């Protein structure tokens, strides 16, 4: 049932009224929208959040215009980087009382893994105000082997390669920059290379043995992985603006403890370069 237009014209516009308390809100929007995106030749179903700031003199936002901003641009589907940027700009145009807007798109990205595919998590965001800040977050699982236990076993057995406990570890790289979004595949590669060993979706017995030997020969603490991620990021993305902000983190799902191990470093490119050069 659709209400008559004359009835809608007589109804008050609640959203445009003054609020009881004149307090500005940073973000008001629609979260969990489903949108199609094209990514590296694949058509994927992604989840999107859209929001705008709300001035202190307005009670609510026009939610339908928010949804319209991203749905218009996703038909036909386009790449998530363009969709984020264009939708953030469109939000400010459609809701001109807002002084900032943002769009985030989340999806599982396919990555070639030998004869099969594996997937890693990607979140792409754009925040628009006087300028546009682009942000990307990549999460992928890898394997880490504990060097502390390996050393104890090596001392006991005097062997060249010592047994130790291994675990799946979740590596995270998050980048906020005024430049274009970095390539998520390259970020995923940095995380995998920083681990003791990558994980595989499809393996046969010789492959499994090779992965374990590689992991044991490259035992790393969670702290080692974070530092290696930072080192590899600087090699690959050192050209980004100096005020680019990065989060590098690892959550290790321990096999011999009843808890996880977590390590992170948050930094700007300018900050980390000065720190490294001072040593």
Swiss-Prot record:
Domain of life assignment: Archaea
UniProt xrefs under Gene3D superfamilies: Urate Oxidase (3.10.270.10)
Cofactor: Fe(2+)
Reaction equation(s) it catalyzes: GTP + H2O = 7,8-dihydroneopterin 2',3'-cyclic phosphate + formate + diphosphate + H(+)
Any Gene Ontology biological process: tetrahydromethanopterin biosynthetic process
MF (Gene Ontology): GTP cyclohydrolase activity; GTP cyclohydrolase I activity; GTP cyclohydrolase IV activity; iron ion binding
Keywords: Hydrolase, Iron, Metal-binding
Cofactor notes: Binds 1 Fe(2+) ion per subunit.
Function (record text): Converts GTP to 7,8-dihydro-D-neopterin 2',3'-cyclic phosphate, the first intermediate in the biosynthesis of coenzyme methanopterin.
Subunit note: Homodimer.
Protein name: GTP cyclohydrolase MptA
Organism encoding this protein: Korarchaeum cryptofilum (strain OPF8)
Gene name tied to this protein: mptA
């Amino acid at each position: 049932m659709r209400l008559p237009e004359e009835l809608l014209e007589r109804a008050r516009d609640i959203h445009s009224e003054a609020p009881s308390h004149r307090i500005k809100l940073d973000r008001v929007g629609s979260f969990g929208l489903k949108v199609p995106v094209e990514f590296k030749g694949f058509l994927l179903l992604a989840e999107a959040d859209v929001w705008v700031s709300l001035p202190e003199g307005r009670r609510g936002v026009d939610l339908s215009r928010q949804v319209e901003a991203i749905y218009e641009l996703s038909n036909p589907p386009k790449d998530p980087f363009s969709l984020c940027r264009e939708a953030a700009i469109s939000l400010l145009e459609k809701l001109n009382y807002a002084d900032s807007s943002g769009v985030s798109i989340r999806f599982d990205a396919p990555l070639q893994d030998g004869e099969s595919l594996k997937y890693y998590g990607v979140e792409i965001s754009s925040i628009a105000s006087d300028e546009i800040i682009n942000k990307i977050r990549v999460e992928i699982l890898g394997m880490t082997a504990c060097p502390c236990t390996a050393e104890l076993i090596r001392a006991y057995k005097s062997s060249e390669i010592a047994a130790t406990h291994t675990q799946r570890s979740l590596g995270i790289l998050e980048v906020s920059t005024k430049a274009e979004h970095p390539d998520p595949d390259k970020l995923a590669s940095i995380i995998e290379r920083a681990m003791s060993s990558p994980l595989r979706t499809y393996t046969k017995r010789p492959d499994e043995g090779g992965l374990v030997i590689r992991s044991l020969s490259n035992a790393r603490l969670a702290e080692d992985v974070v530092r290696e991620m930072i080192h590899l990021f600087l090699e690959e993305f050192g050209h980004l603006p100096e005020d680019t902000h990065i989060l590098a983190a690892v959550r290790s799902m321990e096999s011999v403890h009843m808890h996880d191990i977590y390590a992170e470093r948050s930094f700007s490119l300018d900050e980390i370069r000065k720190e490294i050069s001072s040593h």
